[in-house]
Amino acid sequence: PFTQGFRQGWGNSHALVEGAYEMLQTLHQRGYKLYAASNSFGHLQRMRLQLAGVLPFFEGTYISMDIGYDKPDRRFYDFALNDAHLSADEVLMVGDSMTTDIIGAQQVGIDTCWFNPTHRPIGTTQPTYEIHDLLSLLTVLP
């Protein structure tokens, strides 16, 4: 059926945003613990990360279909923090969605970095940081 074909095709899609591999590799080498957080299907998202060659950079993955809550539900973030044994002040959420990533993380006290490659207006919610290319994150996290 269409849904199965869509999921399989989506799972095989693994092109990275420019600078993503270098950014993840550098942060991993600097000793940062990296976690992926996504609203998607767990096995498909992990397959995409594996095919892109970046899964080894992550300590863990937090996927909505596995957890039972979607971002921006605070229970998603609470689960991830608890599971990773981290407090909100030890985490920086980097994401491209103002609603699910930035607002969701802020509601539990996590600092945020909005990846905004198209220079969209920020609006009323202010992220802690804003970057327009992923390699800029390397200056935010020395």
Please give the residue ranges for each predicted region.
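Asp-based, Mg2+/Mn2+-dependent phosphohydrolase catalytic module
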Residues: 21, 25-28, 33-142
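Metal-dependent phosphoesterase signature
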Residues: 1-19
